[in-house]
């Protein structure tokens, strides 16, 4: 059912009119519902051991909201569960650079802790 609901989402409400103030609240509400749906999908897939599908959903969510660190943390967990801590480390490094360059942000303490727990002292080069 998650997949069915997700397939109906076609992007932000009236995305061709991003500055239309009259629909901004509804656009934000529908966007949040979509992100909550993606969070539920990722969680269910991960619980079922479908880590590739969970990874796909997390990437979709991060494309829609790159600052939503809960999706990054879930993505890192799923990549490690797929046996690809090297991909997780590379994705984390890229995400940190992008977040800093575009928004001037650093990852939260919680995200750094998850990364360190999952990846430890492993670098992108030594996988």
Regions found by a protein language model. Give the residues of each.
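Intrinsically disordered, charged and Pro/Gly-enriched terminal/linker segments
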Residues: 1-127
């Amino acid at each position: 059912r998650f997949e069915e609901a997700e397939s109906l989402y076609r992007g932000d409400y009236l995305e061709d009119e991003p500055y239309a103030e009259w629909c901004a609240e509804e656009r934000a509400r529908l966007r949040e519902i979509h992100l909550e749906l993606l969070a539920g999908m990722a969680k269910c897939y991960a619980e079922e051991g479908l880590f590739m599908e969970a990874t796909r959903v997390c990437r979709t969510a991060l494309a829609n909201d790159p600052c939503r660190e809960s999706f990054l943390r879930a993505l890192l967990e799923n990549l490690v569960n797929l046996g690809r801590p090297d991909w997780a480390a590379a994705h984390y490094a890229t995400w940190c650079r992008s977040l800093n360059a575009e928004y001037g942000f650093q990852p939260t303490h919680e995200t750094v802790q998850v990364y360190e727990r999952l990846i430890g002292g492993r670098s992108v080069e030594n996988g």
